[in-house]
Amino acid sequence: MSFHLSTKERLLLLIDDIEMIAKELIEQAHQKISSTELVDLLDLLVAKDEEFRKMLELAEEQAKVEEAMDQLRAKVEVHDREIQKLQKSLKDAELILSTAIFQARQKLASINQANKRPVSSEELIKYAHRISSANAVSAPLTWCIGDLRRPYPTDIEMRNGLLGKSEQNINGGTVTHQNSGMPSEQQRTLSGSAGSGSGSGAGGEVPNAFQNQFNWNLGELHMTMGASGNTVALETRAQDDVEVMSTDSSSSSSSDSQ
Protein backbone atom coordinates (compact mmCIF):
# COMPACT_ATOMS: atom_id res chain seq x y z
CA MET A 1 0.00 0.00 0.00
CA SER A 2 2.95 2.31 0.60
CA PHE A 3 3.90 2.16 -3.10
CA HIS A 4 0.78 4.16 -4.00
CA LEU A 5 1.96 7.03 -1.80
CA SER A 6 4.34 9.78 -2.79
CA THR A 7 7.92 9.95 -1.55
CA LYS A 8 7.07 12.77 0.83
CA GLU A 9 4.21 10.84 2.40
CA ARG A 10 6.33 7.71 2.76
CA LEU A 11 9.07 9.72 4.47
CA LEU A 12 6.53 11.21 6.87
CA LEU A 13 5.19 7.72 7.70
CA LEU A 14 8.71 6.43 8.38
CA ILE A 15 9.38 9.40 10.66
CA ASP A 16 6.18 8.65 12.57
CA ASP A 17 7.17 4.97 12.93
CA ILE A 18 10.65 5.87 14.17
CA GLU A 19 9.12 8.30 16.65
CA MET A 20 6.74 5.64 17.99
CA ILE A 21 9.55 3.08 18.34
CA ALA A 22 11.75 5.60 20.13
CA LYS A 23 8.93 6.42 22.57
CA GLU A 24 8.39 2.72 23.18
CA LEU A 25 12.08 2.20 23.94
CA ILE A 26 12.13 5.14 26.34
CA GLU A 27 9.05 3.87 28.16
CA GLN A 28 10.41 0.32 28.33
CA ALA A 29 13.73 1.56 29.69
CA HIS A 30 12.06 2.55 33.01
CA GLN A 31 10.29 -0.79 33.18
CA LYS A 32 11.73 -4.21 33.55
CA ILE A 33 11.28 -6.00 30.20
CA SER A 34 12.91 -9.00 28.70
CA SER A 35 15.94 -8.62 26.55
CA THR A 36 14.22 -10.26 23.61
CA GLU A 37 11.55 -7.56 23.42
CA LEU A 38 14.23 -4.90 23.67
CA VAL A 39 16.22 -6.53 20.89
CA ASP A 40 13.11 -6.73 18.72
CA LEU A 41 12.42 -3.03 19.23
CA LEU A 42 16.02 -2.17 18.40
CA ASP A 43 15.97 -4.33 15.26
CA LEU A 44 12.74 -2.66 14.18
CA LEU A 45 14.27 0.78 14.78
CA VAL A 46 17.36 -0.11 12.74
CA ALA A 47 15.17 -1.43 9.89
CA LYS A 48 13.10 1.73 9.87
CA ASP A 49 16.28 3.81 9.87
CA GLU A 50 17.66 1.92 6.85
CA GLU A 51 14.36 2.30 5.05
CA PHE A 52 14.37 6.01 5.89
CA ARG A 53 17.91 6.40 4.46
CA LYS A 54 16.89 4.64 1.26
CA MET A 55 13.91 6.92 0.94
CA LEU A 56 16.19 9.94 1.38
CA GLU A 57 18.45 8.69 -1.44
CA LEU A 58 15.37 8.19 -3.60
CA ALA A 59 14.21 11.71 -2.75
CA GLU A 60 17.62 13.12 -3.79
CA GLU A 61 17.44 11.28 -7.12
CA GLN A 62 13.93 12.54 -7.66
CA ALA A 63 15.08 16.10 -6.84
CA LYS A 64 17.80 15.81 -9.51
CA VAL A 65 15.24 14.51 -11.97
CA GLU A 66 12.92 17.37 -11.08
CA GLU A 67 15.72 19.90 -11.65
CA ALA A 68 16.43 18.40 -15.07
CA MET A 69 12.72 18.52 -15.82
CA ASP A 70 12.65 22.22 -14.87
CA GLN A 71 15.50 22.93 -17.28
CA LEU A 72 13.69 21.02 -19.99
CA ARG A 73 10.50 22.96 -19.25
CA ALA A 74 12.40 26.25 -19.67
CA LYS A 75 13.78 25.07 -23.01
CA VAL A 76 10.33 23.94 -24.05
CA GLU A 77 8.91 27.37 -23.21
CA VAL A 78 11.62 29.07 -25.28
CA HIS A 79 10.94 26.81 -28.25
CA ASP A 80 7.23 27.26 -27.73
CA ARG A 81 7.60 31.05 -28.03
CA GLU A 82 9.66 30.63 -31.18
CA ILE A 83 7.03 28.32 -32.60
CA GLN A 84 4.33 30.87 -31.80
CA LYS A 85 6.32 33.60 -33.58
CA LEU A 86 6.76 31.36 -36.60
CA GLN A 87 3.09 30.50 -36.51
CA LYS A 88 2.20 34.20 -36.46
CA SER A 89 4.57 34.86 -39.37
CA LEU A 90 3.01 31.99 -41.29
CA LYS A 91 -0.46 33.37 -40.64
CA ASP A 92 0.62 36.82 -41.85
CA ALA A 93 2.18 35.28 -44.95
CA GLU A 94 -0.98 33.27 -45.53
CA LEU A 95 -3.07 36.44 -45.26
CA ILE A 96 -0.79 38.32 -47.66
CA LEU A 97 -0.78 35.45 -50.14
CA SER A 98 -4.54 35.04 -49.96
CA THR A 99 -4.99 38.78 -50.55
CA ALA A 100 -2.54 38.71 -53.46
CA ILE A 101 -4.27 35.70 -54.97
CA PHE A 102 -7.66 37.38 -54.61
CA GLN A 103 -6.38 40.58 -56.25
CA ALA A 104 -4.68 38.56 -58.99
CA ARG A 105 -7.92 36.75 -59.71
CA GLN A 106 -9.75 40.06 -59.89
CA LYS A 107 -7.13 41.43 -62.29
CA LEU A 108 -7.34 38.32 -64.44
CA ALA A 109 -11.11 38.63 -64.51
CA SER A 110 -10.84 42.31 -65.51
CA ILE A 111 -8.26 41.43 -68.18
CA ASN A 112 -10.51 38.74 -69.58
CA GLN A 113 -13.45 41.13 -69.54
CA ALA A 114 -11.34 43.79 -71.26
CA ASN A 115 -10.27 41.31 -73.92
CA LYS A 116 -13.88 40.31 -74.51
CA ARG A 117 -15.10 43.93 -74.64
CA PRO A 118 -12.26 46.11 -75.98
CA VAL A 119 -12.52 49.90 -75.74
CA SER A 120 -11.00 52.15 -78.38
CA SER A 121 -8.54 54.90 -77.51
CA GLU A 122 -10.91 57.56 -78.84
CA GLU A 123 -13.55 56.63 -76.28
CA LEU A 124 -10.94 56.75 -73.52
CA ILE A 125 -9.84 60.22 -74.65
CA LYS A 126 -13.46 61.40 -74.74
CA TYR A 127 -14.03 60.02 -71.27
CA ALA A 128 -10.86 61.72 -70.01
CA HIS A 129 -12.00 65.05 -71.47
CA ARG A 130 -15.38 64.60 -69.82
CA ILE A 131 -13.72 63.99 -66.45
CA SER A 132 -11.31 66.92 -66.83
CA SER A 133 -14.11 69.30 -67.76
CA ALA A 134 -16.07 68.62 -64.55
CA ASN A 135 -13.53 67.40 -62.00
CA ALA A 136 -9.88 67.76 -61.01
CA VAL A 137 -7.09 65.71 -59.52
CA SER A 138 -5.57 68.20 -57.06
CA ALA A 139 -6.59 71.00 -54.71
CA PRO A 140 -4.85 74.13 -53.37
CA LEU A 141 -2.71 73.74 -50.28
CA THR A 142 -5.02 76.00 -48.24
CA TRP A 143 -8.24 74.25 -49.31
CA CYS A 144 -10.18 72.29 -46.65
CA ILE A 145 -13.59 70.71 -46.25
CA GLY A 146 -16.32 73.35 -46.22
CA ASP A 147 -14.32 75.83 -48.31
CA LEU A 148 -16.54 77.64 -50.83
CA ARG A 149 -13.79 77.70 -53.42
CA ARG A 150 -13.47 74.94 -55.94
CA PRO A 151 -10.91 72.29 -55.04
CA TYR A 152 -9.07 72.97 -58.30
CA PRO A 153 -7.56 76.20 -59.72
CA THR A 154 -9.64 78.47 -61.92
CA ASP A 155 -8.52 79.95 -65.22
CA ILE A 156 -7.55 83.23 -63.55
CA GLU A 157 -5.51 81.39 -60.91
CA MET A 158 -3.77 79.41 -63.63
CA ARG A 159 -2.89 82.61 -65.53
CA ASN A 160 -1.57 84.21 -62.33
CA GLY A 161 0.55 81.15 -61.57
CA LEU A 162 4.16 80.45 -62.48
CA LEU A 163 3.28 78.83 -65.81
CA GLY A 164 1.16 81.78 -66.88
CA LYS A 165 3.85 84.30 -65.94
CA SER A 166 6.55 82.32 -67.73
CA GLU A 167 4.38 82.21 -70.87
CA GLN A 168 3.84 85.99 -70.67
CA ASN A 169 7.58 86.55 -70.32
CA ILE A 170 8.25 84.40 -73.38
CA ASN A 171 5.54 85.97 -75.55
CA GLY A 172 6.06 89.53 -74.28
CA GLY A 173 9.87 89.62 -74.38
CA THR A 174 11.79 92.38 -76.28
CA VAL A 175 12.86 91.33 -79.78
CA THR A 176 15.75 93.23 -81.37
CA HIS A 177 16.43 93.27 -85.10
CA GLN A 178 20.12 92.52 -85.58
CA ASN A 179 21.96 90.94 -88.44
CA SER A 180 23.94 88.85 -85.96
CA GLY A 181 20.76 86.97 -85.00
CA MET A 182 20.20 85.87 -88.62
CA PRO A 183 21.88 82.89 -90.23
CA SER A 184 24.95 83.62 -92.35
CA GLU A 185 23.28 82.40 -95.56
CA GLN A 186 20.31 84.75 -95.16
CA GLN A 187 22.66 87.66 -94.35
CA ARG A 188 24.56 87.01 -97.56
CA THR A 189 21.29 86.78 -99.50
CA LEU A 190 20.04 90.04 -98.01
CA SER A 191 23.36 91.80 -98.69
CA GLY A 192 23.47 90.51 -102.28
CA SER A 193 19.93 91.59 -103.04
CA ALA A 194 20.55 95.01 -101.51
CA GLY A 195 23.73 95.45 -103.57
CA SER A 196 22.01 94.50 -106.82
CA GLY A 197 19.07 96.84 -106.14
CA SER A 198 21.19 99.89 -105.33
CA GLY A 199 22.71 100.14 -108.87
CA SER A 200 24.93 103.19 -108.67
CA GLY A 201 25.02 103.16 -104.87
CA ALA A 202 28.03 102.17 -102.82
CA GLY A 203 28.73 98.43 -102.54
CA GLY A 204 27.31 96.78 -99.41
CA GLU A 205 25.19 99.81 -98.46
CA VAL A 206 21.47 99.22 -97.88
CA PRO A 207 19.35 101.61 -100.02
CA ASN A 208 16.85 104.01 -98.52
CA ALA A 209 14.02 102.04 -100.12
CA PHE A 210 14.77 99.13 -97.81
CA GLN A 211 15.40 101.11 -94.67
CA ASN A 212 12.77 101.37 -91.93
CA GLN A 213 10.59 98.71 -93.55
CA PHE A 214 10.53 96.67 -90.33
CA ASN A 215 9.56 98.16 -87.00
CA TRP A 216 10.06 95.74 -84.08
CA ASN A 217 7.86 96.10 -81.03
CA LEU A 218 7.12 93.93 -77.99
CA GLY A 219 5.71 90.63 -79.17
CA GLU A 220 4.70 92.14 -82.59
CA LEU A 221 6.30 92.76 -86.00
CA HIS A 222 5.22 95.69 -88.26
CA MET A 223 6.13 95.87 -91.96
CA THR A 224 5.94 99.12 -93.98
CA MET A 225 4.17 98.68 -97.33
CA GLY A 226 5.61 100.88 -100.16
CA ALA A 227 5.76 104.67 -100.10
CA SER A 228 2.34 105.11 -98.50
CA GLY A 229 3.77 104.25 -95.10
CA ASN A 230 0.98 101.82 -94.16
CA THR A 231 2.07 99.16 -91.67
CA VAL A 232 0.84 95.59 -91.35
CA ALA A 233 1.17 93.69 -88.06
CA LEU A 234 2.78 90.26 -88.32
CA GLU A 235 2.81 87.60 -85.62
CA THR A 236 6.24 86.72 -84.22
CA ARG A 237 5.58 83.14 -83.21
CA ALA A 238 8.97 81.81 -84.21
CA GLN A 239 12.34 83.39 -85.04
CA ASP A 240 12.70 81.25 -88.16
CA ASP A 241 9.40 82.55 -89.61
CA VAL A 242 10.49 86.17 -89.06
CA GLU A 243 13.84 85.60 -90.74
CA VAL A 244 12.27 83.90 -93.76
CA MET A 245 9.69 86.69 -94.15
CA SER A 246 12.40 89.38 -93.96
CA THR A 247 14.46 87.61 -96.62
CA ASP A 248 11.46 87.23 -98.93
CA SER A 249 10.51 90.90 -98.50
CA SER A 250 14.04 92.03 -99.32
CA SER A 251 14.13 89.86 -102.44
CA SER A 252 10.77 91.16 -103.69
CA SER A 253 11.76 94.79 -103.08
CA SER A 254 14.99 94.37 -105.01
CA SER A 255 13.16 92.82 -107.95
CA ASP A 256 10.65 95.71 -107.99
CA SER A 257 13.40 98.33 -108.02
CA GLN A 258 15.06 96.64 -111.01
From Swiss-Prot:
Residues 166-190 have a biased composition (Polar residues). Component of the Mediator complex, which includes at least MED4, MED6, MED14, MED17, MED18, MED20, MED21, MED23, MED24, MED27, MED30 and MED31. Interacts with MED10 and MED21. One of its GO terms (cellular component) is nucleus. Residues 52-101 form a coiled coil. Pfam families: Med4. Belongs to the Mediator complex subunit 4 family. This is Mediator of RNA polymerase II transcription subunit 4. Residues 164-208, 234-258 are annotated as: Disordered. Keywords: Activator, Coiled coil, Nucleus, Transcription, Transcription regulation. It comes from Drosophila melanogaster (Fruit fly). InterPro entries: Mediator_Med4. The gene is MED4. One of its GO terms (molecular function) is transcription coregulator activity. Residues 194-204 have a biased composition (Gly residues). Component of the Mediator complex, a coactivator involved in the regulated transcription of nearly all RNA polymerase II-dependent genes. Mediator functions as a bridge to convey information from gene-specific regulatory proteins to the basal RNA polymerase II transcription machinery. Mediator is recruited to promoters by direct interactions with regulatory proteins and serves as a scaffold for the assembly of a functional preinitiation complex with RNA polymerase II and the general transcription factors. Required for activated transcription of the MtnA, MtnB and MtnD genes. GO terms for biological process: positive regulation of DNA-templated transcription; regulation of transcription by RNA polymerase II.
